[in-house]
Structure formats: structure tokens, C-alpha cells
Amino acid sequence: MLKRAVIFTLILSLAAIPAYSHELTIKAPNTAMKEGEPFPATVQSAHKFIVPEEVEILSRVKAGIIEGGKFIPSELKANEQGLCIDFTVTPKDLSQSVILAATKDGESWCVTNEGGKSGARKDFEAQGLKVLSANKYDKYAKAIFNTSHDDKNYGFVVGFPLEIVPVTNPADVKTGDYITVKILLNGQPYTGPVWATYDGFAPEYENTYAYYTEAESGEAHVKITAPGWWGIRAAQSGLPGVEGEYDNLNLRSFLLFEVK
């Protein structure tokens, strides 16, 4: 497969991935952690990186810290003014990097003769509506904090159905370098598109990324073009659905980290 790397702005029209579905990301007001002290962070949902646009339904979202190889969920609070979800973690060990994770169990979204509606295909058909398509969007985000050059935890695999895992230690990456990541789809190597960008690159425009490439056999290389809070994104659409509920399952995943 021919690999394409584009360093200039990409405003991508993703025909297979409708624009009405937001991306799930994690951001913190301050990336510096202190051991044993509360660390605030947010789950954001938006088309623009990384500009919050809406508060997701709390019952569908989980967010927290990875400790001892396990996900420890935090209490979530809707922040209507900030258009995000607030949560707090308390890291116990800062000898290695700290991973925060967030997931959204997406609802079935149906396109009907009366417009877009949230719910199962069978329920709308029972109401006499014509359902043109029914898709479910599950989303995952993983953010790495407190990285160091001797860190061994940055490559921890959380176990998302679609997950981006750094092969290169983010602490070793500088502007002009490439970071290598492996991408797993249900535990197997992912082949497909990969997007990357950083906070402040193009906050005015939706679906706009600083870099594009393609993963081959589960591996992708992204050139870092600026310091800051970076996000690498992968997406898999068209997975088998559940009869009567939705036709296709679509997965989105973000890896987030700081480049100093």
C-alpha cells in the first residue's frame, strides 16, 4: 500500500464517517502532576481539536486512571459552561508515566425519513418510519502524562477495541522527530488512515489535522511539527452491527500526549 504523509493542513471530508459524530478527547488545564494530590482533567467532545462543543450523556461515558494495570473510574460531572465533562484522579505513583482513559458507549443513530434520530432501528420501524441507515459509534481516548526518558509505562495496552499505543517514548520526541505508534483493532494489527494534530493548530476549523498517514500492519509514523498537546487518531467504520439495533459499528480512538 502506498503510504502518504501530508504535513500541510488537511480538511478532510470523511464520507464514511458522518460529520455529526464528535471526537472524544482528554485534556487537563495543567499537565504537571503531584503524587497523592488531586489532578483535574476533562473529557471533551468536538469536531475541532481540541475545542469542546458539547457535554456527552454522562451515563454513556467512563473516565479515570489506569493503576496497577486496571482502570479505576472517576466520578464524572457535567460542565455545561465549559461544554465538557470534569473528572479528577489522584496519582499514587509518579515513578512512571500516568495514563488516563475515557470511553463512550455510543447510541444507535438512525437516519430516517423524518431526519436523524437516536435509537434502535427496530423501534423506529415499529413506528412506521423508514430507516435509511443505523450506525453505532463507540469512542475511546487515552492520554499519557508524567512521561520521562526512563519510563516503561507509556506503551501500556489498555485493551480498547481500537487502541493507539506509542512505540516511541513521547518524552524522547522533539519537534522534527517522528513518533511511531502501533494500532490494534480487536487486538490485531490495524491497517487504515491515521490523523494527527496539536492543540492550537487550527481551532477555527472542523475535522482539520496537521498530519495524515496510513498504518500498515498495525504501525504508523507521525512527524511532530510543533511542541504542545498532540492527538493521534484512528477510525474503523463498517464493522458488523446487531440485528434490529444498528447496521454498522464504527470505532474511533485518540492517543494524546505532550511534546516539550
Question: Which role does the model predict for each range below?
Answer:
Residues 81-85, 208-228:
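Glycine-centered loop-to-beta-strand initiation motif
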Residues 56-58, 187-200:
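Short, ordered, surface-exposed loop/turn motifs in non-cytosolic proteins
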Residues 103-112, 238-244:
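Short acidic/polar inter-strand loop motif in beta-rich domains
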Residues 8-16:
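Bacterial N-terminal signal peptides
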Residues 22-39, 117-179, 184-191, 202-205, ...:
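Beta-strand-rich domain onsets/edges
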Residues 65-71, 195-212:
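Short amphipathic beta-strand segments in non-cytosolic proteins
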Residues 22-79:
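Start-of-domain marker
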Residues 17-21:
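Sec/Tat signal peptide C-region and signal peptidase I cleavage site
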